[in-house]
């Protein structure tokens, strides 16, 4: 069927498939970041319950390092902020790509409209 289609429509279909793949990839990234956000929030909630002089260890690569509650809270808050910004950025990209997907879909349907009858 695609060999019967004009090159312009074939190109639009290829773009549509590419945009669809990009939206799926962004959706996966968004899910991963949301999971990381949830982990950070849970860790922060646990830290807040501890005494200020509690002994805390955190993982850094292959090492486990002793740290303070204050430093751990600060790092987790920074991480939450960074993840939130990344999530906002991904959401904006996802919105733009979804709009582009719908636009391409409409263009293809309009171009194929007379052929479908």
UniProtKB/Swiss-Prot annotation:
GO terms for cellular component: cytoplasm; prefoldin complex. Signal peptide: none annotated. It holds the Pfam family Prefoldin_2. It comes from the Archaea. It is found in: Cytoplasm. Keywords: Chaperone, Cytoplasm. Its main location: cytoplasm. GO terms for molecular function: protein-folding chaperone binding; unfolded protein binding. SUPFAM superfamilies: Prefoldin. GO terms for biological process: chaperone-mediated protein complex assembly; protein folding. Molecular chaperone capable of stabilizing a range of proteins. Seems to fulfill an ATP-independent, HSP70-like function in archaeal de novo protein folding. Heterohexamer of two alpha and four beta subunits. Belongs to the prefoldin subunit beta family. This is Prefoldin subunit beta. It comes from Methanosarcina mazei (strain ATCC BAA-159 / DSM 3647 / Goe1 / Go1 / JCM 11833 / OCM 88) (Methanosarcina frisia). The gene is pfdB.
């Amino acid at each position: 069927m695609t060999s019967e289609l004009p090159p312009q429509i074939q190109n639009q279909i290829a773009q549509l498939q590419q945009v669809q793949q990009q939206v799926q990839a962004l959706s996966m990234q968004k899910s991963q970041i949301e999971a990381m956000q949830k982990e950070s929030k849970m860790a922060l909630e646990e830290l807040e319950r501890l005494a200020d002089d509690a002994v805390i260890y955190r993982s850094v690569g292959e090492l486990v390092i002793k740290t303070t509650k204050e430093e751990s809270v600060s790092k987790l808050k920074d991480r939450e902020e960074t993840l939130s910004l990344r999530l906002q950025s991904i959401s904006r990209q996802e919105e733009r790509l979804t709009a582009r997907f719908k636009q391409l879909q409409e263009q293809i349907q309009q171009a194929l409209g007379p052929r479908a009858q």
